[in-house]
UniProtKB/Swiss-Prot annotation:
The gene is dnaA. One of its GO terms (cellular component) is cytoplasm. SMART domains: AAA, Bac_DnaA_C. ATP binds at G156, G158, K159, T160. InterPro entries: AAA+_ATPase, Chromosome_initiator_DnaA, Chromosome_initiator_DnaA-like, Chromosome_initiator_DnaA_CS, DnaA_C, DnaA_dom, DnaA_N_dom, DnaA_N_sf. It comes from Halalkalibacterium halodurans (strain ATCC BAA-125 / DSM 18197 / FERM 7344 / JCM 9153 / C-125). Belongs to the DnaA family. Residues 329-449 are annotated as: Domain IV, binds dsDNA. Gene3D superfamilies: 1.10.1750.10, 1.10.8.60, 3.30.300.180, P-loop containing nucleotide triphosphate hydrolases (3.40.50.300). Oligomerizes as a right-handed, spiral filament on DNA at oriC. Keywords: ATP-binding, Cytoplasm, DNA replication, DNA-binding, Lipid-binding, Nucleotide-binding. Plays an essential role in the initiation and regulation of chromosomal replication. ATP-DnaA binds to the origin of replication (oriC) to initiate formation of the DNA replication initiation complex once per cell cycle. Binds the DnaA box (a 9 base pair repeat at the origin) and separates the double-stranded (ds)DNA. Forms a right-handed helical filament on oriC DNA; dsDNA binds to the exterior of the filament while single-stranded (ss)DNA is stabiized in the filament's interior. This is Chromosomal replication initiator protein DnaA. Residues 112-328 are annotated as: Domain III, AAA+ region.
Amino acid sequence: MENIHDLWERALKSMEKKVSKPSFETWLKQTKANSIEDSTIIITAPNEFARDWLEKHYDELISETIDDLTGVRLYPKFVIPTSQLDEPFVEQELKKPMKQPPAQNGEMPNNMLNDKYTFDTFVIGSGNRFAHAASLAVAEAPAKAYNPLFIYGGVGLGKTHLMHAIGHYVMDHNPNAKVVYLSSEKFTNEFINAIRDNKAVNFRNKYRNVDVLLIDDIQFLAGKEQTQEEFFHTFNALHEDNKQIVISSDRPPKEIPTLEDRLRSRFEWGLITDITPPDLETRIAILRKKAKAENLDIPNEVMLYIANQIDTNIRELEGALIRVVAYSSLINQDMNADLAAEALKDIIPNAKPRVLTITDIQKTVGEYFHVKLEDFKAKKRTKSVAFPRQIAMYLSRELTDASLPKIGSEFGGRDHTTVIHAHEKISKLLSTDQELQDKIQDISDKLRS
């Protein structure tokens, strides 16, 4: 018998390691497990929006996490708070669920592939292009292209995505293929249990009779001599039988401490490729693909802001997008760069200065001079519009990296010579007009605040 509150605390701690910090803080941290009914665990979400998002995106993660912790497959049902849910947690004995997930590949273990991780959903950029090409080559011709394929890189950069994509591709083109994905930690735990229960032969048969073995985070084998010994023989058996091995790590083989030299040398038999953090263009592409996949309408300025602020890895990037979407929905305000900055202030306390856009400048100048945004793009030449428009063009030239043609296009498709004229005119006036200097300074301060 296990207290459900304690179980959920353990589950949350486990899931915190599996998702980005923004995703955990936004969606999982505020949940509570209320009860267990047959094979269902009742989980309280803070509001309807969070409940709907959890149902769509986190039910499988929760089910797998509880299964890993207890050996019991429970299926989450999300509810919102009611007076009944405020009652104290009740201790319940975990019972075996009524329905079991279907077995895959006959007697083989569940391949544990994530349906969302395919080559189609992978965003290619300069930092992962080679790793993607190598992974696709391996998927198209297992054990004939590169064997083993060793992919390394930092957390959340797409190593696991590529491994799952290889598995999906192989099974799509050969449904009878025996494909297994697992972490080195799970390999270690199963090996220890097999030794304890005198089932070493079963363990060896399980992982030496596959067509493709995808093993994640191999660096965790470091220092585990017996497990390294077992994996060494598993590797040899598969390689000699012309079966594909794909390995991932957070560092190249030569930098994994206390890894046996014989394993290190075998990891170097095939191809070693790395993945580096995505550049700005790739980060924007990742956000656009995520938004499209989730049917979200995200303004370009929001995606640009997030991409400029989050340059570490894909998990944090997508987590930040989800947090902004949630924040916008919960406070019932349209998304813009300012709202994004507010939503992300807790996770990027030392945020980089927001990249100003021409639209930002037009809005601020328009508010200052009481000019409508559309008037900046119209053909109006009255002084009440033309002069603020010239100031906005001047500031766009001074405060952004936009080209002259780009600035002109943002002001109703005007020619770049018009932008040059506006910049020269305002620059000349500023040399003698103290009042204009004060106005420009005031507007600039508002833009930078």
